[in-house]
Amino acid sequence: MNENAGRSLAPQASEGLGTPRDYISLLKPRVMSLVIFTALVGLVRAPDHVHPVIAFTAILCIAVGAGAAGALNMWWDADIDAVMSRTQRRPIPAGRVTPREALAFGLTLAAFSVVVLGLLVNVLAGALLAFTIFFYVVVYTMWLKRSTPQNIVIGGLSGALPPMVAWAAASGSISLESVILVAIIFFWTPPHFWALSLYRADDYARAGVPMLPVTAGPDETRKQILLYTLFLVPLALSPVMLGEAGLAYGVVAGVTGLGMLLLAVNVYRRRTGPAAVTAAKKLFGFSILYLFLLFATLLAEALVRGM
């Protein structure tokens, strides 16, 4: 453990005694909702029929595992969260939950989610969930986040894996389509978070987090956003080309992909002043809608096909 973690375990301003709402906040509900949604798509699109109880158990365990990873991330990053304006009110830096309480909470949920998924669903799904939690907490949070501007690129794998975990829960195997679902989220992550970091660069710099705009500058970040978007858009169309998705998905992926590309070009061109901030915010917001529409269409096609 590094010195930052040592500080994060120091006595806090209060004795903890957090409310249920504080512990829910530790789970990062917004992130958890995305994990649940993308995992549900993986579960429904898997070729095997899944008993409703098994399906519910799988989604529950994946959600709890994601929440556990979020809690452990907040435990480790308490010193960073105390410095950054957008995270200062989180339960640990605000003193409502102590670091030790958050650590115990996160470890308990992580163990529960992996063991239950492995025993009640299948070992492959449990192993993939364990790897996902490990990658997010140890590889990304404890190592990459503070050491390299590629933190989001490499660390993004953990956020991309839930559809594969759910696919494995449903089928007991991994297929090409599950890999494509992971790849779409993986290559979506850098443009999404770099757009955010363009207008939050001062916050990251103050906390000592080497996000790309801090280390390489905003112009290089804009170029990387455009390059990743140029790769992401055709990748998102690949399920149609491979016969895994239908016309509806192709139309949605094509139209929204064009929107992503135009907004990325706008970010690349708008380099100074309020226009640059507005362009980055628009891309950040639209990227969320983009991913949602892609996966919602895949989900809808699978449900219609199963009728």
Swiss-Prot record:
GO terms for cellular component: plasma membrane. The keyword Cell membrane applies. InterPro entries: Protohaem_IX_farnesylTrfase (IPR006369), UbiA_prenyltransferase (IPR000537), UbiA_prenylTrfase_CS (IPR030470), UbiA_sf (IPR044878). It is found in: Cell inner membrane. It is a multi-pass membrane protein. It holds the Pfam family UbiA. The keyword Cell inner membrane applies. It catalyses: heme b + (2E,6E)-farnesyl diphosphate + H2O = Fe(II)-heme o + diphosphate. Coiled coil: none annotated. Its main location: membrane. GO terms for biological process: heme O biosynthetic process. Keywords: Cell inner membrane, Cell membrane, Heme biosynthesis, Membrane, Transferase, Transmembrane, Transmembrane helix. Pathway: Porphyrin-containing compound metabolism; heme O biosynthesis; heme O from protoheme: step 1/1. Its EC number is 2.5.1.141. Converts heme B (protoheme IX) to heme O by substitution of the vinyl group on carbon 2 of heme B porphyrin ring with a hydroxyethyl farnesyl side group. NCBIfam families: cyoE_ctaB, PRK04375.1-2. This is Protoheme IX farnesyltransferase. It comes from Azorhizobium caulinodans (strain ATCC 43989 / DSM 5975 / JCM 20966 / LMG 6465 / NBRC 14845 / NCIMB 13405 / ORS 571). The lineage of its organism: Bacteria, Pseudomonadati, Pseudomonadota, Alphaproteobacteria, Hyphomicrobiales. The gene is ctaB.
